[in-house]
């Protein structure tokens, strides 16, 4: 499914409402990236593709979940956005991905405020180097801020699932606004 397609997202929520009657949690985790590219060489189509999935898609999925959680009885639910470590510390030559993940922080904060009246809690989980196909190149080596190429450690993606499960299982009168889960030895502050 293309999360950046409003029609497809609306159809997903219509189907969810018809089949299940309610929605208690959304893990907003779709993501796209592009090859390491300095800003001066970023192609507009690549920029739009990354922002389309990472920001437009996150907005559309969150909006659909918010509407369903607001309109169901009893009201309420949880939206968990994947913000990434890049929401705090960018990688070199990653302007599209970094911009999209910084924007997720603003989206999370806005949903948090808008959701209070409807018992909708919104959290952001910032994940660093969970082992997925997207992080496969990290094991071989990726560019660092000092110009070197370094292998980066990854962690089992199950640790992310455990963190999401923890957030989802909290009662709606409590929430985690931001959580960071990352490989213990990954470069982070200063990206080196």
Residue ranges and their predicted role:
Residues 84:
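Residue(s) in the substrate-gating loop at a strand-loop-helix junction
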Residues 40, 89-95, 152:
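Active-site loop immediately N-terminal to the catalytic Tyr-X3-Lys motif
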Residues 67, 113-116:
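Alpha-helical segment proximal to the catalytic Tyr-Lys
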Residues 37-39, 46-48:
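Substrate-binding pocket helix/loop in short-chain dehydrogenase/reductase
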């Amino acid at each position: 499914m293309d999360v950046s397609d409003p029609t497809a997202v609306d159809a997903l929520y219509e189907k969810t409402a018809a089949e299940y009657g309610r929605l208690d949690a959304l893990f907003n985790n779709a993501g796209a990236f592009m090859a390491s590219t300095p800003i001066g060489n970023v192609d507009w189509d690549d920029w739009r593709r990354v922002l389309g999935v990472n920001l437009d898609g996150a907005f559309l999925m969150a909006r659909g979940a918010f509407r369903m959680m607001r309109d169901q009885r009893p009201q309420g639910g949880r939206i968990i956005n994947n913000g990434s470590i890049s929401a705090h510390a960018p990688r070199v030559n990653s302007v599209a991905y970094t911009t999209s993940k910084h924007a997720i922080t603003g989206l999370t904060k806005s949903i948090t405020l808008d959701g209070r009246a409807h018992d909708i809690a919104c959290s952001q989980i910032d994940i660093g180097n969970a082992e997925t196909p997207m992080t496969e190149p990290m094991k071989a080596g990726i560019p660092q801020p000092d110009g070197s190429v370094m292998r980066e450690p990854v962690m089992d993606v199950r640790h992310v699932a455990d963190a999401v499960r923890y957030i989802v299982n909290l009662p709606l009168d409590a929430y985690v606004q931001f959580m960071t889960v990352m490989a213990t030895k990954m470069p982070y502050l200063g990206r080196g």
